[in-house]
Each structure stands twice: as C-alpha cells, then as structure tokens.
Amino acid sequence: MTSQQKPRAYLIDSSIYIFRAWHSFDNDITDSDGNPANAVYGFSEFLFELIKKTRSSSGASYIACAFDASQTDSYRREIFADYKANRPPAPEELKRQFSYCRQFCRAAGIADYSSNRFEADDIIGTLAHRLRKQGYAITIISADKDLAQLVLGEDDFWWDYARDNMLNRKGVEKQFGVRPDQIADMLALSGDKVDNIPGIPGIGYTLASRILNKFQTVEDILENISEISKMKFRGAARVQSLVDEHQHILPMTKKLTSIVTDAQFQGPKKDILWQGIDEELIHGIFDLLDAGDMRRKKWLTI
C-alpha cells in the first residue's frame, strides 16, 4: 500500500492545545454560569481548523484526542516520586474546562481517550502502534519533543501545529540530532527539566546526541563507558567520568522517557473515522458555554 493509499490518523496531544488556548484567549469569555470558558473556546477553534485541514480528497478524516486524566497520578510517579513535581497545579478555572473540552470532543464526533494510570503520551503511543499495524500512516500533533520518538513509519509525521512544523523521520533526526527511536535515550542522558527528569550533569541535548551517534542506546553506552574518553570532543574524559559516576540513574530515566505502546485506557471502541458532529450534543455544549449563533452555525455547517 502506497502512502497515498494509506488512511492517515491524526493523534492529538490535547493538553498542550488546551493550555495554549487558556493563555491565548481572553479570560472574560465565560460560560452560562459566569465561569471562564476561554480554553474551551480556543480548543474548539483548534479542532474546527484541524478537521477542515485534515480532510482527505475523499472527505475522510481520522482523528483522536488523548487527555491526561490527572496532572499528578502516573505510573511514572511509581518509578520516580519527583516526576513532574516541579509543576504547579492547574488553576481551578482551567481544571473545570478540561471536562468541557472532552465533552466538546464527543459533541464534535472526535474520539477521546484517557487513563488514570497512563499519560496522554502513552495513549498516543499505544494508538499509533495499533493503527500502524492496521495500515494507517500516523501524524502526531504536539509540540512535545518526547512524542517525536513515535515517528517510526516511513509515512509518519510529528506535527508542531502552532508553528506549522511537520517532521518525518529524517526531519526529526535533523532537528533533534538523533533518530526517532533514540529520542528517549537522548532525554534519558540529558534529563528533561520540563518533566523534572534528572540527567547526567553536564550533558545537554547536543552532547547526548553526539554520544548516541556512536553508541546507539543507553544500554550500549552503559556497556561501553570506558570508550567515551576516546571520542573526539573537548572534555571527553570528564564526560566519561560523569557518566560512570551517575550511570545508576540511566535505567530509571530511560523508563521515564520511553513512551508506552501497550497502555490500557478508557475511550470509545469505535473507529476513529470522523463522521460528523452530533447536533444535539453540539447544541448542548454550546448552551453550557453560552455561545452565540455564529459559532453554532460554523460547526453545524462543517
């Protein structure tokens, strides 16, 4: 099957676009009870635009949204208690809107998934794994570099939607300095401040990618620590010493940075083919949001 013949699945890392809408849209946008609704409005605009953009020549669009059910609970916390401990809790005004965003997905006819144990990344990883085996080409919609590790098929893409930056496997390697299948290794070495994942002191993304160009995985590095000092970059002996001193953290950090592809989660069993909105649900959610006629008409005629 050629890339033109393959159906393409668009898997959305929803939280990023909800947070972006929260910061981008005026907070005087409110629902029927006077509560902030700016994130829902922004997210709905994003979904509308995406559906319009991703329709194939046949009119078909395969879309799914993955949500983080909790900002604090994750199986990764069982591995490392301080995982994401640096993040402040979401404001109550935003937490309320996450529920609205999921309701909006259902009203818009978009499959939505979540888990109390696994993160949206793992849901996307599992969906990508399943759908790729079913013959789909995969596009991951996210600004999170972690998810670039899922660009494994020759027709797969990682799409930073807001910046309109779409990368295939070669593009990922050019931008991040490692192959998609090495992204987790790079982050395990360098750490990830956003998620509060520790790394080897003194090793950033550039140096991590250089080491991984010689030793392909964290496991290979651990078997060849004594060879690092022979590499041709300034301070190689010092880097070897640091890796040797902190090697005990690497198996843990590799687990933290690796996306799960066999996660269990809740969501619709139906095909992710977008088959149009549910008009009754659309009217219901827009009533809750106290939306005007213009927004309703736009969705009713999509």
Please annotate each region the language model reported.
Residues 3-138, 147-157, 161-166, 250-252, ...:
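Noncatalytic, basic helical substrate-engagement surface that gates or grips nucleic-acid strands
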